[in-house]
A protein has these predicted regions:
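Catalytic cores of the polymerase beta-like nucleotidyltransferase superfamily
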Residues: 1-238
């Protein structure tokens, strides 16, 4: 099916109104600095616009890819989320998938990556510009290839990449933990990655190592206690 550009643009405007609250929620959940420019790329935007074009129901769940940039953009950039005609950085009517040249041209910045095409997007960013920082990542749906991607606790950090190679089976566990933590325990997503790391690694280490790790990762004493408490509560249930 082919749509005229005007139809697509109108669908984008309608979709943005439904996407915006979800984006705001994720931005708040990640505790991004105020006035941080946020980009939404991938299937989340694609699905929202497609539903508007076909007059079908759209139920936002997870955002596929979020990229944040702290500095201002040039006048000719049409990819800012806050601009009326933006489409999350994806070229209108051409492809519904992120392109390496887009990353290279616009996203020379730290990135926060969430979502379905996790491995493709990380590789596009990492191999095209190996100096680029990946601040956080969470594969909600799983890998789209057999590549092994770096994962760790992914607490937001502005000064370094926090990664650790893990086996691909971590992804399926990560999804279960993410749902469990958020829905059953109401635990912040960032803390769930720390707990997941502990569950994956602390069987081979002493409790002292665990406390040292959490002290290093989480400065807030109350949050640190919560992580350790939930670690013990959940360890035998997952």
């Amino acid at each position: 099916m082919i749509w005229y550009l005007e139809d697509v643009e109108r669908a984008i405007c309608r979709a943005r109104k439904k996407i915006a609250p979800v984006v705001d929620g994720v931005v708040n959940d990640l505790n991004l600095p105020k006035n941080t420019d946020v980009f939404v790329v991938g299937g989340f935007v694609r699905d929202a616009v497609f539903c508007e074009l076909t007059n079908t129901k759209f139920e936002p769940k997870d955002i596929d890819l979020i990229l944040s940039k702290k500095s201002d953009f040039s006048q000719n950039n049409n990819m800012l989320w806050k601009q009326e005609n933006s489409f999350g950085g994806i070229k209108l009517g051409l492809k519904f998938f992120p392109e390496v040249d887009i990353f290279d041209k616009y996203f020379d910045c730290p990135a926060i990556i969430v979502g379905q095409y996790f491995d493709f997007n990380v590789n596009s960013i990492y191999y095209h510009n190996k100096t680029r920082q990946i601040l956080a990542a969470a594969p909600f749906y799983g890998f789209t290839s057999n590549k092994t991607i770096e994962l760790e606790s992914f607490l937001i950090s502005s000064d370094k990449i926090e990664t650790l190679y893990k086996e691909p089976s971590l992804v399926s566990r990560a999804l279960k933990f993410q749902v469990l933590f958020r829905e059953k325990y109401g635990i912040d997503a960032r803390l769930s990655w720390t707990i997941l790391y502990l569950l994956q690694n602390m069987d081979k280490q002493t409790e002292q190592k665990m406390f040292e790790y959490t002290q290093q990762k989480i400065k807030d004493e109350n949050l640190r206690k919560q992580v350790i408490e939930q670690y013990y509560n959940i360890k035998t249930k997952c």
